[in-house]
Amino acid sequence: TGGLDIKPSSGMLLMKKDMGGSAVAIALAKILIELNFKINLKLLVPIAENSISEKSMRPMDVVFSRNKTPVEIGNTDAEGRLILADTITFAQEGETKVDLIIDFATLTGAARVALGTEMPALFSNNKKIAKTILDNSLKKNDPLWELPLFNAYQRFLKNENGTLSSTGFSGTGGAITAALFLQKFLKNNVNWVHVDMMGWNLTDRPGYPKGGEASSIRALLYALNELFN
């Protein structure tokens, strides 16, 4: 619903698809297991119910992330990046070396404004991995488009009080600033892929019925096979 920054009723109607990133992550992990991929795989699924109650976060509240970073809540409807940030932190804990973190999320409307509903936005800090994914997206007719981790936009995430803004304050480039926010929780520049997706077909088209859509699975599956298997 958006929490205290509540969505209009029309904006809530499709929110049953807001678990699309988790669905894709679970599906991809299931396929990798069934195909007996020779990788050490960890699946993490952060889940939140974002409704109004006496315990609701307020805009401009400051909370501490799992790694103790102070984060100012710019908009309570942007809860996904908060739980993703903590999950990225959790994924790097322990003594096992992490070679790659992939996250899937129905994160921003800005990605839909940039690319429409049928093409997820891809971000990565590793050009080779990004190219491998994009090449396989073309081969398997599973379209993604890379957007930049434009470093100059980092300044939009830093508040005057020294905290990290969860949403930034530029008003534009929201998919990029959301990705930059998540990137701040990587340690030692670990290889990372972020997929900002719709997870839903608004209309019927051949092979893609109206409803939930498992976009990016084929592209990532074949890319991982090429990179690691």
Where are these regions (language model features)?
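A generic structural signal for tightly packed, nonpolar segments enriched in small/aliphatic residues
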Residues: 1-229
